[in-house]
Swiss-Prot record:
List of residues that carry N-acetylmethionine: 1
Feature: compositional bias, Basic residues: 715-737
Protein name stated in the entry: Alpha-adducin
Role played: Membrane-cytoskeleton-associated protein that promotes the assembly of the spectrin-actin network. Binds to calmodulin.
Modified-residue entries (Phosphothreonine), positions: 331, 429, 445, 480, 614
Length: 737
């Protein structure tokens, strides 16, 4: 090694910078007004502009002068050449192709066909091409049959059942005239439309050629005519040649019951087919082999035939027959022979199979009762319509449920009403009559604008009336002003099961009527409480307001309650003494009045006083019987007034009232004299004695108004007399009456 060698310094080239990658914002000027306008644009508006850019090419074609000139020339050519020029038909086809919406994904056909090629190109010929004057020549039933049969041909092409221009599917149009629809000979299944079908009779003669110039394969229709002649119930006949069907028709064992599709066909008929039918003996033999009930006929070494009472039923049987043949052909190829197969018992399957009139599947609501094959055929028609075929099929039951509005249209208030309340020229004041009229208008407008939570449904025709009637039914989701909060009064953090148990318990109590006042107090449960009222002392004006369980015997009285029932024995005794003391003073006044009356001259009339309106009870009815006992015995007293009568029965009580004393100073009015002279009705003896006492007392009070015998004293300085209780006072008006 070299001794003067030293550590070398390794120098690396400077790192190369990565090339600048152009970004989106490098190409955009943020200060550009166009960029700012597009950035601030709403997403929906930006999407609309993008759609307009995509449709710009179509708009350019429609707005081009060349297109307008060509269209005008074709219209002028139509006026010159007639109804259906070739250019107009071509333009109509172009319009059909452009307006048809073809999805990006198509269902894969089992065997393929010409329709698959057409769909891949994005061009589909519509099935229902009956437009304008073409549809006038056919009635509604024939139009529907033409659309169904043409759609059936399209399905056969999609499933791969077609064999170039051969094989036929026919349907009966009219049973009386024996007219049938068949495809023109030379037209592919993918080209068949409703207007291109040919109408023929039972002998094969053309009745209506349709929209084509092609004829009919009468030799091919011979098989169909033989079946139609033998089976009046048959409305549709299908004759196809499939590889699997031809393979099964060549087997000696025939169609084996190894699949549900094979068992769903029922009794299968066989016929040794020897080519095109040329003689009548062959027709009779076919009719004999088919029988009156068979729906499926296998032509030996030739093909398959299915019949049905409708187009849908014929499609159902031919579809199951083709599937059963494919299953059998593949099974025998893998099993090695019929002896290695497990056969099903047709008798057991027949008991479980659905009848022709039973509905297939039940959905929500009330779906129609499907016939055999109708539900499957309708589903395939929806598929064709989604692909853009425009089948014109009348759907019996829509697959998609229409979302019913939560609130009916009539619930939306009217934006404009035809009622005006005040005009511009009116003043603020109005008459009461006009105000009332405007109030009626406001009520009517409010009723018109207020929605109703009902839904209208049209009822069909019935036997009684041919008109349809509108029936209003209550809507389920009717709007309410306030929403009910569930479990509003349930405390938080509670067990839901306990709440439900308590709710059920309350409901049972309500049903069994065992409501109580609540839990019984544990403190007062042993205390025995005596009733303050005993039996027979409850006074009321009606027995209906008294519970019979507690008061079975009630005293009915129209007078008021006794005010002395609440007083004790001591208070009653004091009151009795006070009454006796006041009574002695009244007796002295009565004696003075008698003396004054004797001294008065005989020609001076006595001042008359009307008797009281109501009699006073006798002594024995007024004096309570004093009893000795505790305070509870006070409740046993009879509800009567205290004793206010003197000891002698001849002497009556009289209570001088202040009103009577003031009236005594007045001179007798002339109106009072006839009152005294008027005869009074003869009352009972007891009230007469009672009425004499107050009159005598009043006469004494009139003779000597002063209590101390001085007639010169003023009434204000009189000695204070005992005043009767308020319940015994009689008004001045009653006393004068």
């Amino acid at each position: 090694m070299n001794g003067d060698s030293r550590a070398a310094v390794v120098t690396s080239p400077p790192p190369t910078t990565a090339p600048h990658k152009e970004r989106y914002f490098d190409r955009v000027d943020e200060n550009n007004p166009e960029y700012l306008r597009e950035r601030n644009m709403a997403p929906d508006l930006r999407q609309d502009f993008n759609m307009m850019e995509q449709k710009k090419r179509v708009s350019m074609i429609l707005q081009s002068p060349a297109f307008c000139e060509e269209l005008e020339s074709m219209i002028q050519e139509q006026f010159k050449k007639g109804k259906n020029p070739t250019g107009l038909l071509a333009l109509q086809q172009i319009a059909d192709f452009m307006t048809t919406n073809v999805p990006n994904v198509y269902p894969a056909a089992p065997q393929g066909g010409m329709a698959a090629l057409n769909m891949s190109l994005g061009m589909v010929t519509p099935v229902n091409d009956l437009r304008g004057s073409d549809s006038i020549a056919y009635d509604k039933g024939e139009k529907l049959l033409r659309c169904k049969l043409a759609a059936f041909y399209r399905l056969a092409d999609l499933f791969g059942w077609s064999q170039l221009i051969y094989n036929h599917i026919t349907t009966r149009v009219n049973s009386e005239q024996e007219h049938f629809l068949i495809v023109p000979f030379g037209l592919l299944y993918s080209e068949v439309t409703a207007s291109s079908l040919v109408k023929i009779n039972l002998q094969g003669d053309i009745v209506d050629r349709g929209s084509t110039n092609l004829g009919v394969n009468q030799a091919g229709f011979t098989l169909h005519s033989a079946i139609y002649a033998a089976r009046p119930d048959v409305k549709c006949v299908v004759h196809i040649h499939t590889p699997a069907g031809a393979a099964v028709s060549a087997m000696k064992c025939g169609l084996l019951p190894i699949s549900p599709e094979a068992l769903s066909l029922g009794e299968v008929a066989y016929h040794d087919y020897h080519g095109i039918l040329v003689d009548e003996e062959e027709k009779v033999l076919i009719q004999k082999n088919l029988g009156p009930k068979s729906k499926v006929l296998i032509l030996r070494n030739h093909g398959l035939v299915s019949v049905g009472e409708s187009v849908e039923e014929a499609f159902y049987y031919i579809h199951n027959l083709v599937v059963a043949c494919e299953i059998q052909a593949r099974t025998l190829a893998s099993a090695g022979g019929p002896d290695n197969l497990v056969l099903l018992n047709p008798e057991k399957y027949k008991a479980k199979s659905r009848s022709p009139g039973s509905p297939v599947g039940e959905g929500t609501g009330s779906p129609p009762k499907w016939q055999i094959g109708e539900q499957e055929f309708e589903a395939l028609m929806r598929m064709l319509d989604n692909l853009g075929y425009r089948t014109g099929y009348p759907y019996r039951y829509p697959a998609l449920r229409e979302k019913s509005k939560k609130y009916s249209d009539v619930e939306v208030p009217a934006s404009v009403t035809g009622y005006s309340f005040t005009s511009d020229g009116d003043s603020g004041t109005c008459s009461p009559l006009r105000h009332s009229f405007q109030k009626q208008q406001r009520e009517k407008t409010r009723w018109l604008n207020s929605g109703r939570g009902d839904e209208a449904s049209e009822e069909g025709q019935n036997g009684s009336s041919p008109k349809s009637k509108t029936k209003w039914t209550k809507e389920d989701g009717h709007r309410t002003s306030t929403s009910a909060v569930p479990n509003l009064f349930v405390p938080l953090n509670t067990n839901p099961k306990e709440v439900q148990e308590m709710r059920n318990k309350i409901r049972e109590q309500n049903l069994q009527d065992i409501k109580t006042a609540g839990p019984q107090s544990q403190v007062l449960c042993g205390v025995v409480m005596d009733r303050s009222l005993v039996q027979g002392e409850l006074v009321t004006a009606s027995k209906a307001i008294i519970e019979k369980e507690y008061q079975p015997h009630v005293i009915v009285s129209t007078t008021g309650p006794n005010p002395f029932t609440t007083l004790t024995d001591r208070e009653l005794e004091e009151y009795r003494r006070e009454v006796e003391r006041k009574q002695k003073g009244s007796e002295e006044n009565l004696d003075e009045a008698r003396e004054q009356k004797e001294k008065s001259p005989p020609d001076q009339p006595a001042v008359p006083y009307p008797p009281p309106s109501t009699p006073i009870k006798l002594e024995e009815d007024l004096v309570p019987e004093p009893t000795t006992g505790d305070d509870s015995d006070a409740a046993t007293f009879k509800p009567t007034l205290p004793d206010l009568s003197p000891d002698e029965p001849s002497e009556a009580l009289g209570f001088p009232m202040l009103e009577k004393e003031e009236e005594a100073h007045r001179p007798p009015s002339p109106t009072e004299a006839p009152t005294e002279a008027s005869p009074e009705p003869a009352p009972d003896p007891a009230p007469v004695a009672e009425e004499a006492a107050p009159s005598a007392a009043e006469e004494g009070a009139a003779a000597d108004p002063g209590s101390d015998g001085s007639p010169g004293k003023s009434p204000s300085k009189k000695k204070k007399k005992f005043r009767t209780p308020s319940f015994l006072k009689k008004s001045k008006k009653k006393s004068e009456s």
